[in-house]
């Protein structure tokens, strides 16, 4: 009962509106009647016959277009029924797609005059119960058409400015219009002054603003490809496309509106346009990706934001398309294959933006060109007769010379008593000190000859028994002995006592003479190197303590035994000691084989003559001549 009453009330309202349009309309009553019939209160789809009639009438002149926009705007403003409002929006959508481009211009002009035709943010249905979801869809549908009109205006401004967004748009087509049917009837027969004069020349149309006249005056603008646009133009188009996609995603019906047949019919052209919308967004994203790595930092940030927001929108678009396929809005084969924006691509773009941000903080310094040097002033010749001498200075006192700067006192460094960093004394340094001690000072007798003294004082710790003391003939003393140094008075350089020096050499000879019978080539208990011409030692003795055996006929300037020799000397010494050790082991084995019978066994083994160890020459007159240093008394 309530439904039938509502339908009856709707029919009465429609008939009343039609009657008022026929009587009160001054401009185009037929157009207003067709608009009322196309936006009736019936819960059915509008008849295509009335829509074609409206399209035909609006194609005649600009006046019909203006009347159509005014009538539809008044219909949307007064109605409180979501069915009437939805049919009116579907009519506007059809006119935007298939109508003349002047329809878009009229809506834009009405918007500039303050008449926001598609602004239905405050719409609320009052004719039906539980119609909140339907009213919400009407509001979102109107916002989608409004944003699409903004995109068309943006494209028109781009063409008027010499650029376009894509190659498929021209002559006011925003790229989402479907192919127009050839629904327009031939122009009606006109009078002769409208078609031409008797001479066959065309005349100007009588109605100002005729569609044909405007189309003839409109110039075709050159189309600019998307890749040749400036970054500002590309970002502007991307912003409009993304806002339009947001409005489309918000058109998804909820609640009871998902089961309404009228809403599903209104969704079909919107979903069809979203296919082209998705393709345009992908095209712009591809252009941004190609130019991303060559953009400025601010443009890179804008491109990254566009990619991030597009990734979220595409995820919602995939879910929306799944719902449309399940509901039956359009065929499944018509839907495009939507590709997601991978997180890996977003991470790569984000890392690049961060790198560009770091480089932007420290820009490269630009070399500033130095200003050109001013031309040197031209000096005028000076007249020497005009130059006057300066007067002498009065009470001129020269400034005192500056006081010399005091030299900084060097800090006294107290050496450490136990300085581990101090270098050890080498053998060469010790030899140099000893040589300076020998030859530093002049002789004590100043080069004068002194006769030998006839006293019996002993001047040497070693006296040759062959020299007889007390003889005055010094030539005979020199012939008989060369080692009698008792009468020598020569002083060494540096004040060195000759008695001390001679005693140093003679003391070694004395100890060598005393220990000759006990020494062997190796250690004190060695049997490998006995003295030539002598038998082995009487007993096997232990090695002598340090300091008891001294070497004779050795260079006094040789390196000290307390200082380790170089590595190559140690290696040679080790080879020699290894050889002697091997030889001594062989002799001990032979001695054991002989039964260890003492000197008898050792006598058999000492048949061959061996050399002295360590390069020490013999002093007993046997063997090869000594190779060391000898001290000879010059007297």
Swiss-Prot record:
SMART domains: ENTH. It comes from the Eukaryota. Residues 157-208, 357-412 are annotated as: Disordered. Residues 23-159 form the ENTH domain. It comes from Arabidopsis thaliana. Residues 175-184, 357-369 have a biased composition (Basic and acidic residues). The modification Phosphothreonine is found at residue 224. Coiled coil: none annotated. GO terms for molecular function: 1-phosphatidylinositol binding; clathrin binding. Residues 165-174 have a biased composition (Low complexity). PROSITE patterns: ENTH. One of its GO terms (biological process) is clathrin coat assembly. This is Probable clathrin assembly protein At4g32285.
């Amino acid at each position: 009962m309530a439904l039938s009453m509502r339908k009856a009330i709707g029919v009465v309202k429609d008939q009343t509106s039609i009657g008022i349009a026929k009587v009160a309309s001054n401009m185009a009553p037929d157009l207003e009647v067709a608009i009322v019939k196309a936006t009736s209160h019936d819960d059915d789809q509008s008849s295509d016959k009335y829509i074609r009639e409206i399209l035909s009438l609006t194609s005649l002149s600009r006046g019909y277009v203006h009347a159509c926009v005014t009538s539809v705007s008044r219909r949307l403003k007064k109605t409180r029924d979501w069915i009437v409002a939805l049919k009116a929006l579907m009519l506007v959508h059809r006119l935007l797609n298939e109508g003349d481009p002047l329809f878009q211009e009229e809506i834009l002009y009405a918007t500039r005059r303050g008449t926001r035709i598609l602004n239905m943010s405050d719409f609320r249905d009052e004719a039906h119960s539980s119609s909140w979801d339907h009213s919400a869809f009407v509001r979102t549908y109107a916002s989608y058409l409004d944003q699409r009109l903004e995109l068309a205006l943006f494209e028109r401004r781009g063409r008027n400015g010499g650029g376009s967004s894509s190659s498929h748009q021209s002559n006011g087509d925003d790229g989402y219009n479907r192919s127009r049917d050839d629904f327009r009837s031939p122009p009606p027969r006109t009078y002769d002054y409208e078609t031409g004069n008797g001479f066959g020349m065309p005349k100007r149309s009588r109605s100002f603003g005729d569609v044909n006249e405007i189309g003839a005056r409109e110039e075709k603008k050159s189309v600019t490809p998307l890749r040749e646009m400036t970054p500002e133009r590309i970002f502007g188009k991307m912003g409009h496309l993304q806002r339009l996609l947001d409005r489309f995603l918000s058109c998804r019906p909820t609640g009871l509106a998902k089961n309404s047949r009228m809403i599903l019919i209104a969704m079909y052209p919107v979903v069809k346009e979203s296919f082209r919308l998705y393709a345009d967004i992908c095209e712009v994203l591809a252009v941004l990706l190609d130019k991303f790595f060559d953009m400025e930092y601010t443009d890179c940030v804008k491109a990254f934001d566009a990619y991030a927001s597009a990734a979220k929108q595409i995820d919602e678009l995939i879910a929306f398309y799944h719902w449309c396929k399940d509901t039956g809005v359009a065929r499944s084969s018509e839907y495009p294959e939507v590709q997601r924006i991978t997180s890996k691509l977003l991470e790569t773009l984000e890392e690049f933006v961060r790198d560009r941000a770091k480089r932007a903080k420290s820009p490269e310094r630009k070399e500033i060109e130095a200003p050109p040097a001013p031309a040197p002033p031209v000096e005028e010749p000076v007249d020497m007769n005009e130059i006057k001498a300066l007067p002498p200075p009065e009470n001129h006192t020269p400034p005192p010379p500056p006081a010399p700067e005091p030299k900084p006192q060097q800090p006294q460094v107290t050496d450490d008593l136990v300085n581990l960093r101090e270098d050890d004394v080498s053998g060469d340094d010790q030899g140099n000190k000893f040589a300076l001690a020998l030859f530093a000072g002049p002789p004590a007798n100043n080069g004068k000859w002194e006769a030998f003294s006839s006293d019996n004082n002993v001047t040497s710790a070693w006296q040759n028994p062959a020299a007889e003391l007390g003889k005055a003939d010094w030539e005979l003393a020199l012939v008989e002995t060369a080692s009698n140094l008792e009468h020598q008075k020569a002083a060494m350089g540096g004040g060195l006592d000759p008695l001390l020096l001679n005693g140093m050499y003679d003391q070694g000879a004395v100890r060598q003479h005393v220990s000759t019978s006990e020494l062997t080539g190796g250690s004190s208990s060695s049997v490998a190197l006995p003295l030539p011409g002598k038998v082995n030692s009487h007993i096997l003795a232990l090695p002598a303590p340090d300091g008891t055996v001294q070497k004779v006929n050795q260079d006094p300037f040789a390196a000290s035994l307390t200082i380790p020799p170089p590595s190559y000397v140690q290696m040679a010494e080790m080879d020699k000691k290894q050889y002697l050790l091997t030889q001594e082991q062989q002799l001990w084995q032979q001695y054991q084989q002989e039964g260890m019978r003492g000197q008898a066994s050792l006598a058999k083994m000492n048949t061959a003559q061996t050399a002295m160890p360590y390069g020490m020459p013999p002093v007993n007159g046997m063997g090869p001549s000594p190779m060391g240093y000898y001290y000879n008394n010059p007297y």
